Amino acid sequence: APGDRIYVHPF
């Protein structure tokens, strides 16, 4: 779904 966090940036 749009807005769902699937990948978290390693920053």
Swiss-Prot record:
Tissue localization of expression: Skin.
CC per GO annotation: extracellular region
Domain of life: Eukaryota
One biological process term in Gene Ontology: vasoconstriction
Compartment(s) where it occurs, according to its Swiss-Prot or TrEMBL record: Secreted
UniProt keyword annotations, A-Z: Secreted, Vasoactive, Vasoconstrictor
The protein, known as: Crinia-angiotensin-2
Organism the protein comes from: Crinia georgiana (Quacking frog)
